[in-house]
């Protein structure tokens, strides 16, 4: 009698078709698990021993299992299983028996694949309701559509479905329904081979990888059985190559690196179970390492179904072997690192060798060049000796310095050229200029000095004593060797003979340094000119002052402004007894018109010339029958010297009242209108177009025309000359047409000027600020407006407006007064600048 009913797993061998009946015959599973101590047991309860098969089952019976046993559904109808399926199950048993005959090794067992989890094909229970009554064919599927019109078919046809083609926009759907293949027996999926249909094989061809996976699965599936041959598991070895160790580095726990012996330091080790005290760090490195792997191996496996007894275990030996392996791996890694370090060191040393070779080559080149430079300097020193038969000249010395600069530039730049120039060039330069007279030969030595300028200038050199020289070699050369000659000739020079000195400085202005030229003009030339201006008397001196002052304007420019005030004072004194009939005053004053500022010139004219001209016009007698024009010519000759407004004021005050009075008296005495017309046109032709364009002058001549028209229209006198009225009317029309044309032409010119300025200002269409407004006004009045470089007041930039120094702060212009800065208006600023 079999006791298989005591095992819950054995229920898979009971015939599932028999209602609540248990077979007591011995099955294959009973034979295979007869000597298996780890098989799962089901101990019979007291209730089962008493009632047997009529005992109530516990809830664990309802749990799913690999046996396929399920609780019966007694409410379902009785179904009968066809005999054909039984035959298929027998065939599956034969296949399983064939697989059991194959020897299975123990090492091929899966890790978590035990005998309790896999059963034979006959033990797998299919669904109670599956395949009952046999599988139905899909041939007559939807046969009712032959006699009826289904709503599904109609909807599909409305959406574009064509019978016989696939669904979808491009008819990409399948045409035939998915075929199903009936499984032969009651085994699991894949127990009877491939279950793929012909349609599946066509649509999805079988690849080799699936066949390999199937073979692998069958191989692992058969490993649940016990190895009948009783063979032992073959040990597996893991090999590591040197390349793997180099690539992955240290594998496993790191070994403590050797440390240097430190001084006696108390170290408390609390890493273990007990606190330990060490007196150096080296003792920690010598501490015994507990074999962790060994401890794990010493732990006994937990009792259970998968536990295997270990017959032979030596954890100490395994730890020592593992330690030797770790040490060997560490040595391999250390040796690889040392080898890589040595290779890197070789590469580094090779680079350093190349670099040192380059440095050595450069130093050799420098030594060679310095040797050649030293030879050239020694040669110059030898030729400068007094008893030398071939003395060194200044031109030859310049060529030697050119060679040093072109071929040995680095050595020449690093050398102390100031000392070299002082030792070699200065004696030669002094000997070169010893007989030179600058006023007689002003261009002597300009070529050789210009050459030395390119050789010695623009270098600030530190002397051997470490003191910073204020000037370079060329500046020192000019100051010490050239300036003494200039000082000597300036002390003997007469300022009224200015041409030789001006020519001399013009020849040297582009060669000598700027600060030396400023020193000559400020310290030597200007004091001589100032002293000569003080001694000048415009009444007695026959040489005009502008003849020896104006030639200095290109060189000195604004430096001469302090001389202008005493010159104006002396001229004012000389003009006190002057009469306009003396034309020499105009010859003396005319050269100064463009030198003085417009404001100072106009003030000088108004004070000294305009009153004299007014007196001359007062003395003018207007007589149409016998006119003397000398006084009028004396006044008109000053038109370019005095402003138009001043001249118009003189004419309005001293000329036109008398002229209109004479016209009225002439018209009241039976005049000849032709003579009056000629007289009118004659006086008008005496004035220039600029004067005639002035509105006041136009008004005076128009007033004369009105007087003439009134005289003609009022029939003054007993006799009227024929055509006089027409002539006067024609004259009036002609004159006014000329005035109109002149005004139109002036407006057109102003429009063109505005257009030109508009084109120039089109690019800068941004709103003008106060500074731009001042700049515009300065351009309109020909006043120089520019910033003073490097000068500020309270952080504000200083500007020069003519001769006035100003600064702008928040839209207000401030002018420098005697003690403080005073705010002023723009018009006042323009008046002060003039």
Curated annotation (Swiss-Prot):
Residues 1-20, 85-132, 182-206 are annotated as: Disordered. One of its GO terms (biological process) is spliceosomal complex disassembly. It is found in: Cytoplasm; Nucleus. Residues 91-101 have a biased composition (Acidic residues). GO terms for molecular function: nucleic acid binding. Residues 1-50 are annotated as: Required for interaction with DHX15. Residues 1-11, 102-115 have a biased composition (Basic and acidic residues). Residues 707-731 are annotated as: Required for nuclear speckle localization. The modification Phosphoserine is found at residues 2, 97, 143, 209. It comes from the Eukaryota. A motif (Nuclear localization signal) lies at residues 697-702. The keyword Transmembrane helix does not apply. Residues 148-194 form the G-patch domain. Keywords: Biomineralization, Cytoplasm, mRNA processing, mRNA splicing, Nucleus, Phosphoprotein, Spliceosome. One of its GO terms (cellular component) is spliceosomal complex. InterPro entries: G_patch_dom, GCFC_dom, STIP/TFIP11_N, TFP11, TFP11/STIP/Ntr1. Identified in the spliceosome C complex. Found in the Intron Large (IL) complex, a post-mRNA release spliceosomal complex containing the excised intron, U2, U5 and U6 snRNPs, and splicing factors. Interacts with TUFT1. Interacts with DHX15; indicative for a recruitment of DHX15 to the IL complex. Interacts with GCFC2. Belongs to the TFP11/STIP family. Involved in pre-mRNA splicing, specifically in spliceosome disassembly during late-stage splicing events. Intron turnover seems to proceed through reactions in two lariat-intron associated complexes termed Intron Large (IL) and Intron Small (IS). In cooperation with DHX15 seems to mediate the transition of the U2, U5 and U6 snRNP-containing IL complex to the snRNP-free IS complex leading to efficient debranching and turnover of excised introns. May play a role in the differentiation of ameloblasts and odontoblasts or in the forming of the enamel extracellular matrix. This is Tuftelin-interacting protein 11. The lineage of its organism: Eukaryota, Metazoa, Chordata, Craniata, Vertebrata.
């Amino acid at each position: 009698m079999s006791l298989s009913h005591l095992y819950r797993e054995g229920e898979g061998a009971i015939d599932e078709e028999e209602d609540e009946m248990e077979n007591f015959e011995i099955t294959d599973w009973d034979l295979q698990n007869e000597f298996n101590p780890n098989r799962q047991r089901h101990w019979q309860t007291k209730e089962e021993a008493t009632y047997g098969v009529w005992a109530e089952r516990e809830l664990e019976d309802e749990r799913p299992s690999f046996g396929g046993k399920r609780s019966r559904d007694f409410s379902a109808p009785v179904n009968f299983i066809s005999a054909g399926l039984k035959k298929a199950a027998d065939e599956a048993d034969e296949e399983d028996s064939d697989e059991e005959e194959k020897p299975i090794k123990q090492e091929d067992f899966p890790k978590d694949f035990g005998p309790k989890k896999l059963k034979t094909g006959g033990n797998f229970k299919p669904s109670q309701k599956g395949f009952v009554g046999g599988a139905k064919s899909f041939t007559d599927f939807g046969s009712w559509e032959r006699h009826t019109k289904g709503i599904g078919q109609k909807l599909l046809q409305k959406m574009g479905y064509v019978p016989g083609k696939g669904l979808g926009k491009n008819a990409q759907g399948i045409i035939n329904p998915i075929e199903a293949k009936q499984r032969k027996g009651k085994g699991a999926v894949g127990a009877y081979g491939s279950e793929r249909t012909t349609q599946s094989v066509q649509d999805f061809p079988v690849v080799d990888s699936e066949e390999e996976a199937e073979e692998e699965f069958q191989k692992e599936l058969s490993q649940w059985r016990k190895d009948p041959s009783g063979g032992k598991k073959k040990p597996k070895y893991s090999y590591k190559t040197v390349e793997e160790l180099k690539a992955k580095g240290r594998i496993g726990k790191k070994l403590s690196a050797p440390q240097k012996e430190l001084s006696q330091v108390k170290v408390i080790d609390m890493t273990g179970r007990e606190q330990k005290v060490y007196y150096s760090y080296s003792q920690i490195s010598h501490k015994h390492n507990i074999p962790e792997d060994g401890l794990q191996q010493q732990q006994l496996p937990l009792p259970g179904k998968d536990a295997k007894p270990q017959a032979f275990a030596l954890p100490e030996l395994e730890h020592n072997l593992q330690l030797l392996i770790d040490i060997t791996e560490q040595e391999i890694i250390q040796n690889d690192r040392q080898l890589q370090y040595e290779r890197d060191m070789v590469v580094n040393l090779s680079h350093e060798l190349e670099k040192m070779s380059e440095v050595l080559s450069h130093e050799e080149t420098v030594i060679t060049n310095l040797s050649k430079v030293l030879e050239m300097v020694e040669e110059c020193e030898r030729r400068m000796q007094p008893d030398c038969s071939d003395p060194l000249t200044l031109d030859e010395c310049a060529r030697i310095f050119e060679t040093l600069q072109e071929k040995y530039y680095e050595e020449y730049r690093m050398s102390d050229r100031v000392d070299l120039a002082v030792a070699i060039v200065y004696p030669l330069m002094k000997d070169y200029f010893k007989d030179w007279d600058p006023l007689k030969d002003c261009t002597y030595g300009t070529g050789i000095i210009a050459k030395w300028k390119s050789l010695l200038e623009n270098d600030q050199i530190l002397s051997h004593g470490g003191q910073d020289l204020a000037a370079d070699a060329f500046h020192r050369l000019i100051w010490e060797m050239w300036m003494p000659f200039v000082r000597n000739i300036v002390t003997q020079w007469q300022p009224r003979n200015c041409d030789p000195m001006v020519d001399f400085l013009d020849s040297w202005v582009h060669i000598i340094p700027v600060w030396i030229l400023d020193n000559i003009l400020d310290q030597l030339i200007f004091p001589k000119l100032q002293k000569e201006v003080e001694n000048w008397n415009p009444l007695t001196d026959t040489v005009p002052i502008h003849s020896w002052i104006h030639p200095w304007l290109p060189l000195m420019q604004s430096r001469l402004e302090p001389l202008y005030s005493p010159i104006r004072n002396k001229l004012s004194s000389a003009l006190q007894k002057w009469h306009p009939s003396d034309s020499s005053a105009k010859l003396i004053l005319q050269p100064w018109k463009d030198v003085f500022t417009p404001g100072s010139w106009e003030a000088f004219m108004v004070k000294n010339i305009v009153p004299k001209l007014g007196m001359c016009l007062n003395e003018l007698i207007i007589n149409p029958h016998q006119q003397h024009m000398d006084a009028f010519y004396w006044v008109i000759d000053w038109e370019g010297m005095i402003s138009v407004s001043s001249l118009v004021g003189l004419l309005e005050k001293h000329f036109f009242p008398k002229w209109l009075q004479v016209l009225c008296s002439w018209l009241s005495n039976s005049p000849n209108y032709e003579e009056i017309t000629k007289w009118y046109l004659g006086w008008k032709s005496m004035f220039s177009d600029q004067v005639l364009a002035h509105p006041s002058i136009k008004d005076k001549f128009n007033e004369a025309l009105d007087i003439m028209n009134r005289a003609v229209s009022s029939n003054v006198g007993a006799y009227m000359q024929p055509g006089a009225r027409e002539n006067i009317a024609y004259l009036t029309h002609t004159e006014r047409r000329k005035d109109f044309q002149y005004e139109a032409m002036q407006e057109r010119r102003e429009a063109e000027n505005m257009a030109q300025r508009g084109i120039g200002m089109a690019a800068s269409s941004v709103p003008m600020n106060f500074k731009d407004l001042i700049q515009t006004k300065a351009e309109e009045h020909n006043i120089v407006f520019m910033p003073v470089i490097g000068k500020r007041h309270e952080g504000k930039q200083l500007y020069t407006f003519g001769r006035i120094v100003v600064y702008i702060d928040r839209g207000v212009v401030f002018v420098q007064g005697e003690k403080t800065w005073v705010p002023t208006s723009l018009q006042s600023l323009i008046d002060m600048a003039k």
